[in-house]
From Swiss-Prot:
The gene is HSP17.6B. This is 17.6 kDa class I heat shock protein 2. GO terms for biological process: response to oxidative stress. Residues 39-153 form the sHSP domain. Keywords: Cytoplasm, Stress response. It comes from the Eukaryota. The lineage of its organism: Eukaryota, Viridiplantae, Streptophyta, Embryophyta, Tracheophyta.
Amino acid sequence: MSMIPSFFNNNRRSNIFDPFSLDVWDPFKELTSSSLSRENSAIVNARVDWRETPEAHVFKADLPGLKKEEVKVEIEEDSVLKISGERHVEKEDKNDTWHRVERSSGQFTRRFRLPENVKMDQVKAAMENGVLTVTVPKAETKKADVKSIQISG
């Protein structure tokens, strides 16, 4: 627990003396964290969970309101998983009066460097209820051969 109170942490881990802290105060952060940018950050900063099972690496991205046609999953350079997409702004009709516009729009791109022990040719993606699931199967790791050596002497 820090001896100095933090006014900028928003309930996240913050410690100015910890070099590995996730949230050290940034004076320029306030310029980009207006309520407007926070509202639009839902799609622009798509949240992704990455878990590893014994069989695969599984990525889950929350993409509420997006259709699968608006999302792309690609493998770059044989080692980078790229998830990208775009939500378009609804067309305005000159006869309509908008009282509130809160749904986010914009583009997003997330990249993840994959480990060497994966089967790039067997990557699968599925989208259900606004959640994209990308499964990257693991390649079987070859167990090292152990050979006993006789000690002479």
